[in-house]
């Protein structure tokens, strides 16, 4: 039975790894062991930050809605309570976009939410 040599597969693995480490600084771009660690850590950061991105966008939308609503004399929590009572089914992303780009439309949403709040 012939001996199996793994030089080709090792070279392919190393090449794929170094391609992933392209653009890194120092020995992280051309030393196999260090590049492997750097690529693995980059993957961990990417996985974590895909989750963080959702949180930070939601926080941004809330800040934008809050700023627009406070100009009309409500707090964010009062506004959201009024939105729920009024049965308005717009999510925060859409409301933040309305607050930024369509002030008249968002003003009507605020008026509906105010009307739904108990006096």
Curated annotation (Swiss-Prot):
Annotated S-S bridges: none
GO cellular component, one term: ribosome
Record keywords, A-Z: Ribonucleoprotein, Ribosomal protein, RNA-binding, rRNA-binding
CDD domains per the UniProt record, alphabetical: Ribosomal_L20
Pfam families: Ribosomal_L20
Family according to the record: Belongs to the bacterial ribosomal protein bL20 family.
Biological function: Binds directly to 23S ribosomal RNA and is necessary for the in vitro assembly process of the 50S ribosomal subunit. It is not involved in the protein synthesizing functions of that subunit.
HAMAP family: Ribosomal_bL20
Protein name: Large ribosomal subunit protein bL20
Species annotation: Erythrobacter litoralis (strain HTCC2594)
